[in-house]
Amino acid sequence: MADKTVVLGYGVTGRAVVSALVSRQEKVRIVDENPTQNLEEVAQESGIEVVDVTKGFSWGEVLKDCSQIVLSPGIRDDHPIFASARDASIPILDEFDLASRWDKRPCSAITGTNGKTTVVTLVVEILNQSGIRAEAAGNTDIPLVQAIDDSDVEHFVLESSSFRLAHSLNFLASPATWLNFAPDHLDIHRNLDSYEQAKSKIWDGISRNEDAIANLSDPVVARHAPNGCTSFGTTSSTCRVQNGFLLFREEKVIALDDVLRKFPHDLENAQAAVATAIRSGATQEACAEVLANFSGLPHRMEDLGFVKGVRFINDSKATTPHATISSMRAISEVTLILGGQNKGLNFGDLGVLKPNGVVAIGEAADHINEVFQNICPVQIAKNMQEAVEKSVAMTRSGGTVLLSPGCSSFDWYNSYKERGDEFRSLVMEHGRKVKDE
């Protein structure tokens, strides 16, 4: 009898999926292509079947007695499990599908190449301010299958990556918001079209067209937006910036002078958050309260202050050229620390930038040097300390040192957070040294 669920990948999401299935008396088989001792210990203690990929196996054998497959985020589009599942007519699911099957509480969903975490955070805060108990889940530290264990939550706000959307079958979220689109994750998706199609699935589960919240200033998003959607990003959108105010429909939500963060991308995020929150049941008063006090998240245009007249900004979360371009548009007189591990993206787009200087880091340093060598001075740094030292030497008083790498962090670090933390620490150390001089 085919009654087992194969869980591919045993990271944060995989562990949560296995735990949720086991707690519901489901039979589970774990496949992890980078097994750890911890996984072996879990298998021994719980009696869960684990496939040891180091000892030789076939996907046909792995899928024997299997009724469904749940993928962890980040499985490549060309992974052999897809062909094997198709041949055996076994459905492939995402954790969102399981959670939607088990729990019917309302969900909002946010996707986009950039800005997801910020908008999710804003929507959660606005809903809570409105008296609706909300929690973030999904592409966060808490997968949805884990979040639904909290019976006090009234509304889930889901950070929805392309990895999750690509393999969801029956995921229901309404409203659902698409922030923007730019090349990303081409080391995972077959091509740019595959990435776009994954993102567009955000609207598959909406209840009505008004619950599709779309950035109409982005041509890719606009192309997929249904008629009657709730829009933002243009001067004629449902939610827009006009005459010094942020409006929803024709009502003033908040004066721009009262919004704490006013970079162009901040105002776009604010529009998305207001539209999503109001469609989720929030009040305009709550929107205004949150936007007036929201100072941003770490590693996202995080202002570290000034040292001898030079401003330092930590934008380590910028892991694509698109994100770096967006950040650079917000400031001038910039020395840019750029680089890391490329995700199969085209750095040529960065050529539109006009920084005062570039410090190139990581695996992509040589490629970045090629892009900017005829635009501005470029130096290559072997580590972050050297990058900070060289950027300081290149920057005059009144200028800004911006860490906005445009790449993932996995050449030097375990995460963009670790990269940003080191940059922040080095800037603080630089400030102390200058003060002691």
Where are these regions (language model features)?
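N-terminal leader/targeting and accessory segments in enzymes
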Residues: M1-D94, L98, I361, Q379, ...
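Phosphate-binding loop of NTP-binding sites
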Residues: D3, F57-K64, P73-L216, V220-C229, ...
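Nucleotide phosphate-binding/pyrophosphate-handling subdomain across enzymes
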Residues: K4, A16-A20, R24, L256-P355, ...
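Residue-level detector of alpha-helix initiation sites
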Residues: V12, R76, N114-T118, L267, ...
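Residue-level signal for inorganic ion chemistry
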Residues: L21, I69, I110, N139, ...
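Short internal beta-strands
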Residues: R29-E33, A212-L216, I337-G339, K354-A364
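Beta-strand->loop->alpha-helix junctions that form or flank phosphate-binding loops
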Residues: D32, T54, L93-D97, L216, ...
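C-terminal helical cap/extension that packs against the catalytic core
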Residues: L39-G47, L345-G399, K435-E437
